[in-house]
Structure formats: structure tokens, C-alpha cells
């Protein structure tokens, strides 16, 4: 199954495509000083829930980068009330961002689109104007395993904060997903994929979708639930 198709199935029921609530994301209104006239860039925007919320209330100029056409179709069909958002379909790494040109640069759960957390932060800071906000959300390590399992694990929140600051943005705020937030997010994926499989018993991708769903659920239960969290860091560029 094509990964874009899989994620369109797994996230069919959700607009906020991260393990965090709308209430927590609305804190970014203040942390990023959202107001009329700002230029906002959202890397791996998905359905662009956050940027669309801002554009409903403020006359921002937004750009969303996204690889999945299903997510972009969803976002494009919901025109914002005040601002304007342009969407660019394709790999984020192919987008040439003018240096020092955006007031807010977001990447929530999609640092892989820029090569990983460190590379994403470097790219984002370069695109942000001095005084602007860099907003990056990613998996973080909460509890190290008692025995070395030799599996790749993300940085912890303090290490992630250090990466942002070393690249020239002073971290001014953090938002953390709760265990319940992540449980709900993972459960949405699992439920949506199982429902799709029941509704499409003869689909050629059915077995692959179920295999990927089981792998994701197992990773949540065995790795995310006991050891990992998800953290948004807000950095103000020097």
C-alpha cells in the first residue's frame, strides 16, 4: 500500500493530525503572537488545522507544504474567513524558502520531511525572520529503557530544546502531549484502519493496511506508551 493512501485511511476521522488537543494548540496564538499581516509557513501541514484556524481569525498569508493529495484536498475545500493560504504539493525538501522571510515557521510531527529533527530545525530557523517564531513538534524520549534494546529512540525534551537554541532560536514555550492525548491519537488510527478493512474486504491493499496498522499499534503499546512523549517547542529567532 502506498504510504500516502495508508495515512489517508488512518487519519480519515481527525483534523488535528498530532497527539495533542485543540485547546493546547490554541496556546500557540499567544506564544507566536498571531496577528494580521503575518507570513506563516507550515511544513508537512497535512489538513492544516492550525494554520486554517489562524486564517479564519486573522489576515495572515500562509503557505502549506504537503505530500499527500488527500490531505490537501481536504484543506483546500475549507476556505479561511480572513487570511489566505496557498498549498504546495510535493516533497518539503524541494521547496526553496527565502531566508529570513517568514514570521512563523511550523513543523508539527513532520520533521522527517526535512531529513530529521536537527536538519528540520536548521532549515526552519534559516527561513524565519529575526524575532519570528520557530514551532517544532516531535516525539521525545521520556523514560530510557532499563536494558539497551538497540532501537532508535528520539532525543529527550531537554536535548531537543538544546538543538533549537544551538541553531539560533531561544525557546520561550513548550507544549507536551499527555498520555491520554497519545492514547486517543493512536486509537483513532487503529480504529479507522480496522473499520476500513471491514468495509473493504476485497480490496487488494487490505492485508497490507492491516499489517501496517498492527505494527503501528504494537509500536504505540511497546515503545511510545512506556517510553515516549510528544513535545512542541516554540523558539524565538535571535
What are these regions (language model features)?
Residues 118-133:
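A short glycine-rich, Lys/Arg-flanked "PGG" loop and its adjoining helix->strand segment in the class I
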Residues 47-94:
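Class I SAM-dependent methyltransferase SAM/SAH-binding core
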Residues 37-44, 135-159:
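Conserved class I S-adenosyl-L-methionine
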Residues 177-238:
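Conserved Class I S-adenosyl-L-methionine
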Amino acid at each position: 500500500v502506498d504510504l500516502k493512501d495508508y495515512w489517508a485511511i488512518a487519519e480519515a476521522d481527525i483534523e488535528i493530525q498530532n497527539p495533542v488537543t485543540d485547546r493546547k494548540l490554541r496556546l500557540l496564538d499567544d506564544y507566536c503572537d498571531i496577528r494580521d499581516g503575518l507570513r506563516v509557513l507550515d511544513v508537512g501541514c497535512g489538513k492544516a488545522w492550525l494554520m486554517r484556524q489562524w486564517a479564519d481569525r486573522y489576515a495572515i498569508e500562509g503557505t502549506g507544504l504537503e505530500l499527500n493529495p488527500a490531505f490537501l484536498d481536504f484543506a483546500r475545500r475549507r476556505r479561511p474567513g480572513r487570511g489566505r493560504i496557498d498549498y504546495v504539493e510535493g516533497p518539503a525538501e524541494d521547496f526553496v524558502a527565502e531566508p529570513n522571510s517568514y514570521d512563523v515557521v511550523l513543523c508539527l510531527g513532520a520533521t522527517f520531511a526535512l531529513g530529521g529533527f536537527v536538519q528540520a530545525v536548521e532549515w526552519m530557523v534559516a527561513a524565519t525572520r529575526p524575532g519570528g517564531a520557530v514551532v517544532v513538534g516531535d516525539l521525545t524520549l521520556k523514560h530510557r529503557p532499563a536494558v539497551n534494546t538497540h532501537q532508535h529512540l528520539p532525543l529527550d525534551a531537554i536535548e531537543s530544546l538544546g538543538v533549537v537554541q544551538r541553531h539560533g532560536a531561544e525557546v520561550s514555550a513548550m507544549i507536551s502531549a499527555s498520555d491520554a492525548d497519545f492514547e486517543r491519537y493512536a486509537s483513532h488510527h487503529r480504529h479507522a484502519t480496522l473499520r476500513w478493512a471491514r468495509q473493504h474486504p476485497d480490496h487488494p491493499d487490505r492485508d497490507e493496511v492491516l499489517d501496517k496498522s498492527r505494527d503501528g499499534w504494537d509500536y504505540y503499546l511497546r515503545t511510545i506508551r512506556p517510553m515516549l512523549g510528544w513535545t512542541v517547542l516554540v523558539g524565538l529567532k535571535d
